[in-house]
Amino acid sequence: MQKVIKWLAVTALALSIGVPVWAEQTFVTIGTGGVTGVYYPTGGAICRLVNKKRKEHGIRCSTESTGGSVYNINTIRAGELDMGVAQSDWQYHSYRGTSKFKDQGPFKGLRAIFSVHPEPVTILARRDSGVRHISDLKGKRLNIGNPGSGTRATWEVIEEAMGWARSDLKLAAELRSAET
């Protein structure tokens, strides 16, 4: 009997040495934007860096193409995304519970990890369009951005500040950044 126990102990030890210890993997998903925009490759670059060392730290990263900043923030808040790329102004509004996030209240659990690049509002018009001031946009064709994007949310702030309705534009296109 003692021989059998000794043999089982040696066999168990040999098997445990030969089998790697499997660390529990943690999966992280980063919400980005449209696949042709800037946010998607940004998320992809982050995931490539994380995944290079995944055997060491046990974290596996993937990206998800989304509607953009506002969508990402709302989805993080709902617990459906781990991280997301977002314009800093919309992160600020979400954290404070202002503007588009007023009804939801402050999202104090939201944190910034780093800044990718500044995103100022830029309005371009042809020289012969007659647009010299923001008020000259009324009655014009304009890309207001896709729903869920920071571009769209920023346009809605401008629209409200100007006292306009969507019908005040000749055409309100909902194009993604890469389509403009």
Which sequence ranges carry the predicted segments?
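Conserved functional loop/turn residues at catalytic and ligand-binding sites
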Residues: 12, 80, 141
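Pocket-flanking alpha-helical
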Residues: 47-48, 62-103, 179-180
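A structural signal for short loop-to-beta-strand junctions that line the ligand-binding cleft
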Residues: 102-116
